[in-house]
Amino acid sequence: MSMELFEVHEGKAKVLVPKAKTIYDSPVFYNPRMAPNRDVVVLLLNVLKPKIVLDALSATGIRGIRFALETPAEEIWMNDINELAYELMKKNVLLNFKGTLKENAKRAIFEGEKTIVINNDDANRLMAEKHRYFHFIDLDPFGSPMEFLDTALRSVKRKGILGVTATDGAPLCGAHPKACLRKYLAVPLRGELCHEVGTRILVGVIARYAAKYDLGMEVLLAYYKDHYFRAFVKLKDGAKKGDETLENLGYVYFDEKTGRFEVEKSFLSTRPNAYGPLWLGPLKNEKVVGEMLELLVSGFEVANYREVLKLLHMLHEELDIPLFYDTHALGKRLKIEPKKLGEIIKELKSMGYEATRTHFSPTGIKTNAPYEVFVEVMRKN
């Protein structure tokens, strides 16, 4: 390898990373800003304890190495189509584990307390080869995960767990609606609700793809952070489970003039200006998120403690219903000076409604109060 390398520490792992002007110029991609993303999945794997796991698009191998060092996983697969990445992954595994690699063709295996398999191939080809093999697969591509989703759903066990990241915010947030229609088979919504609608479009398309294989699913956690969308789902075996899951699909109707929205669970939209289809079911399993938070607070070591604590705390407390009111956007539309979020939440609760902040927007409130009530509370002096 002719790359100039430097050492990076993240969590319990240390990895060699190529020197480059920007992360996008690097011959092998490593993004330090995605460390919290990796922290969250490490916490999840400690709660759910899958044994055989795959990081399908590994680059430097940081995610897979952290799985090996920081989770109970027993067999960890790391894969990248890039030969330089493959060579770097081998170096990085040996930087963290004492021993030797047994290499055969484009696969190197480390046997120790854990089995680590380093693979140099197209992710789709590897996942097609390992049919119903993995307890957990993580798809964290550069851009859209859609070209890998089908194969991942066939490679993971029928009751396995799938992690999916999408970093193509422009299509999912409605800036490129045609690209969203092509890739995610859904119409996105531009504006203040775009991050939640984008998250729900991603979860919705996973549900539709899974249903083809007579699989249902439960959302363990889905969120938006730092320009990426993230979803973890647990698959459920059987056509009936698939049918039940599809009942959570539907559409959002949004009035641009007033900021009023409605949601409808339906396979087809019943009126114009529908955004979707998208997921209208829960975006979290309360128990799983609670256990992740508990683990973190108990002193579990992650790379970005404060950031992840803030995120998980917000996700845990957040009201799990579709969409929210953005106080600034509503204030602009209705020509009202927006009040403090805390005041609005307090007022709504005193009226018997549920209300919380949302991680999707620093100026947003999730509530089961009707639009008219929310506006009335905003107008109050």
Swiss-Prot record:
UniProt GO MF annotations: tRNA (guanine(26)-N2)-dimethyltransferase activity; tRNA binding
Q: Corresponding gene?
A: trm1
Q: What is the protein's given name?
A: tRNA (guanine(26)-N(2))-dimethyltransferase
- Gene3D superfamilies named in the record: N2,N2-dimethylguanosine tRNA methyltransferase, C-terminal domain (3.30.56.70), Vaccinia Virus protein VP39 (3.40.50.150)
The residues the record assigns to binding S-adenosyl-L-methionine are 38, 63, 80, 122-123
A Pfam family this chain is assigned to: TRM
Give the matching InterPro entries: SAM-dependent_MTases_sf, Trm1, TRM1_arc_bac, tRNA_met_Trm1_C
Complexes and interactors = Monomer.
Spell out the SUPFAM superfamilies in the cross-references: S-adenosyl-L-methionine-dependent methyltransferases
Q: Which family does it belong to?
A: Belongs to the class I-like SAM-binding methyltransferase superfamily. Trm1 family.
State the EC number(s).
Answer: 2.1.1.216
The chain positions of domain Trm1 methyltransferase read 6-378
Q: Which GO terms describe its biological process?
A: tRNA N2-guanine methylation
Name the reaction it catalyses.
Answer: guanosine(26) in tRNA + 2 S-adenosyl-L-methionine = N(2)-dimethylguanosine(26) in tRNA + 2 S-adenosyl-L-homocysteine + 2 H(+)
Is tRNA processing one of the keywords?
yes
> Which keywords belong to this entry?
Methyltransferase, RNA-binding, S-adenosyl-L-methionine, Transferase, tRNA processing, tRNA-binding
Glycosyltransferase as UniProt keyword: no
**Species, as recorded:** Pyrococcus furiosus (strain ATCC 43587 / DSM 3638 / JCM 8422 / Vc1)
